[in-house]
Amino acid sequence: MSDLIQANYRLLRVLPRFGIHLGFGDKSVVEVCRAQGVSMELFLLVCNISTFDDFLPDTAMFKGIDVEDIVLFLQNSHKYYLEQRIPEIRENLSSLEEGPVTSSARILDRFFNDYRNEVEAHFEYEEQTVFPYIRGLIHGVHTEGYSIEQFEENHSNIEDKLEDLKNILIKYLPGEVPAEELNRTLFNVFLLEDDLGRHALIEDK
């Protein structure tokens, strides 16, 4: 397991979503997953998605994995984004407000708050509608008036506003913005955008 983390530090953002924490010594991936009650197949699939930019999973790769494990991982990911990654960027933007470009920073802050609300609504839709529907199908219960095709139609691309935010940060803020704070904010936006894109690959399949 330690070799896996050494090979791709981005997996540090994946481990908590599986309930896996550092300190596993020389244990193998199999041993760590077994100890945490984690599906090794799902864990390795997520690792591949998180590591290789050209890795595109197909539906067949998920067939041997318990759907409940996938749903639980997606729920944990939602919690991770809402409680850690998004507040981190919000804090970055707040630090820009303390500089000499308060008005610009506040515009960014409002823009990001709108984005956060959109993400929360998107996740809430999945948590309250899509996931219960999937769990119902597993147990042979069909929800009248809803189909998975509706999820596909409503699965809006919540990365679009992050693209807009990146453009604002890169192109339009005055030069007086503290470079270190701006770079830190932009870096975290890039990380979130990349992570959400890989998260969407799992949801779509």
Predicted regions and their residues:
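Small-residue-biased structural context
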Residues: 1-205
